[in-house]
Amino acid sequence: MRNKLTEFCLITSLGLYAATSAAEERMSAPIAKKQPHTITTHGDARVDNYYWLRDDQRESPDVIEYLTQENNYTQQQLEKGEPLKKEIYDELFSRMKQDDESVPYNYNGYTYRSRVVAGKNYSIYERRPVNSQGEWVVLVDGNERAEGTEYYRMGALAISPDNTTLAIAEDRQGRNEFVVSFRKIDESEWQENVLTNTSGNIVWANDNQTLFYVNKDKQTLLPYQVVRHQYGTQQTQDKLVYEEKDDTFYVSLAKSTSKDFILIGITSTETSEYRLIDANQPQNDAKILKPRQVGVEYYPDHFNGKFYIRSNHQHPLFGLYIVDNISAPWASFIAPRDGVDLEGFALFNNWLVVEERQNGLVNIRQISWLTHKENQVSFDDPTYMAWISNNPEPDTDTLRYGYSSMTTPSSVYEINMLTQEKQLLKQEEVKDFNKQNYQSERIWVTAQDGVKVPVSLVYRKDLFKHGQNPLLVYGYGAYGYGIDPSFSSSRLSLLDRGFVYAIAHIRGGDLGKNWYIQGKTIHKMNTFTDFIDATKGLLSEGYGKAGHVYAMGGSAGGLLMGAVVNMAPNLYEGVVSAVPFVDVVTTMLDPSIPLTTGEYDEWGNPENEEDYWRIKAYSPYDNIKAQHYPHILVTTGLHDSQVQYWEPAKWVAKLRDIKQGNSLLLLETNMNAGHGGKSGRFNALDDIAQEYSFILMLENKDKYFPYLK
């Protein structure tokens, strides 16, 4: 398919668009043809003039030509800013350490690390025996594996317990479909037998011959089957272990801390179930730990003969329970507490470490098994991100954790849990960065229903002028996923030009379970009004200047962008909407589209009439109005499996037809990428440079867009 797409991208117009001179084309955007397609649901007929832009095979000449015309138009509109884009790219590149390596860690007799080398996009993974000062042995060189491909991502690297065999999962298209390959570590050649159509989730059993993996449905791409593979055999001989029949659930795999169990996770947005396979008897059937119950989530681990389970079966928030065996009652160890979300835990011989979120910020607590004495890791910044890092060996009194803030580069620490002595192992090196030049803050703004919404922000001290700075507000607000306020070296290119950068921790994500519930399904509108209110609050507090306000979000955050430009178009000068989920009604009505069925608990199921009208009330594609809109840059990937390319393409086509005024509306489709954009550490910088240069060009329209006056 890639060769066909390349040819289509190179050909001239197929007659869908009128030819224009170069000067005229700068001012006239592609106009997509209209082919009315009526979708009637609950007696409501929606006419979609751009439904034809959907091509599941991604080969339609008309579709490819339209996307190519949009790409050309975007390039022409932004070409005057190419020197600015290059300047920003060079800044981003210069801040990136060219030769770098991770903090090594010990596991099963070996020390592991990854590293990157100057001029190369991908990581190299290596190991050597513990306490050895000898040469590192290369396990996988991502640069070699990526040769000849436009896109490359390694999803998993798994080594057999006897340290002899390597399995890796790789995606070469950007659709999260992984191929698993094998190699004996002491041999250079990769084996011919591969496993296709997998989720990238792979786990070895303890016999060193059995590998469990997850199959994806070929149409919906849902991970739905657990399969057992015998090393050295053909995939056609593999045995089905478990198949999930309910397409609102996803299947995943993990191995317990004890290494005694393969954990089969069957999860939806708000319900989970786990099945266990004896890792020492991988031919045995899986046993259910606790049958699923709607609205109940639990997440188990196993260590020292007991199960440790994070669950909300007794309370809307999570507690931690200890279970002696599958049939034993669950004994509460950490009771659920209002206002505290237990988000994760790590098991050690002498310690339990828990990761909890309170008021949107993460706390890390250490608890002694022997004395039950507790200690909490202290953090200095007013707003920050912290997490339990990689601790693969439990027989230690040392905890490794990560920390970052909007003014503190990503850092890896170790803390002695006996003495509480901390050691900084590594901090991201950023050329010419001085933390003292920047200020981070956390403020609370009042939403229209009276709820207080936190906002994390950062700016350069010497460039901050009350009420005079350009302001960029970022948001997501879905799946309960927190956009924690971490450091970004790329962001410095905005801060050093006087921008205030803010993250609005809106309902739907960020502050824990209750905050999530208040921003999903029947409460989804809160997500959008929170973002608008957060922006207004920032302006009223002097963190930005009206007419110089910008917004950015991607995926579900792209939905957020689509909703807020419909609801408050005059609040923002420019918007960047990356891989936006904007045709919510049509997508959620089609169970054949990847991710649809698994997200009914997030958005609702429009086959239900109440859900239908509620979703339609905010779906960006269905609420475009004949009004002035801000300048908008939309990006997508042709091979995106999470938000199909045709959603942003249709949205742009319809916006261009209906909106008033001459604001810029640009669509860029990466013909070789998926949901995550370009692969490789340097290639990804190009996307950031384009987004930032677009915003900076709008800050200087007289120079870059004089025709927009």
Please annotate each region the language model reported.
Residues 505-709:
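Active-site-proximal cap/loop segments of hydrolase catalytic domains
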Residues 7-13, 17-398, 402-410, 414-419, ...:
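Beta-propeller folds
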Residues 301-302, 314, 346-348, 358-359, ...:
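A structural signal for short secondary-structure junctions
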Residues 154, 196-202, 217-221, 246, ...:
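Alpha-helix capping and helix-loop boundary segments enriched in small/acidic/polar residues
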